[in-house]
């Protein structure tokens, strides 16, 4: 039963992606972030290779600067940062400050929003939607990154970025290249 359920979920996701753009299967790598399920699908040449739990914005989805919302639409990885850093390393201003985060496994929201382990910095690909004045994902510093608040993964809790478990973002970092597409819907 579980295998049938997984196949149904995968087929359902692939149908969603195909409705966005039918030529997705020609992309070497696609990261598809499904906001309703709080999951990211790692797709190679049209096949789902892995599924990661994520956390999008607590404030919902939207593309405006200073909204703290997760931007929708097609993006690409602009820059990868944090290669070879220790797991749970805290990055401030995209640079390791030498500190290691204490990971919170309970579903607790803290007063800090540490960016940890790795950063995949996103750039919008859709002029007027997630690229351009007042809505630019890259200028908003929208990332896929690790978090100290791992207990909140699986539900909206970020300030706009896509949060992942630290071990997962380290794994993903090594599997994707800059310019790989990231679709957030």
Where on the chain are the PLM-derived regions?
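N-terminal pre-domains immediately preceding structured catalytic cores
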Residues: 1-185
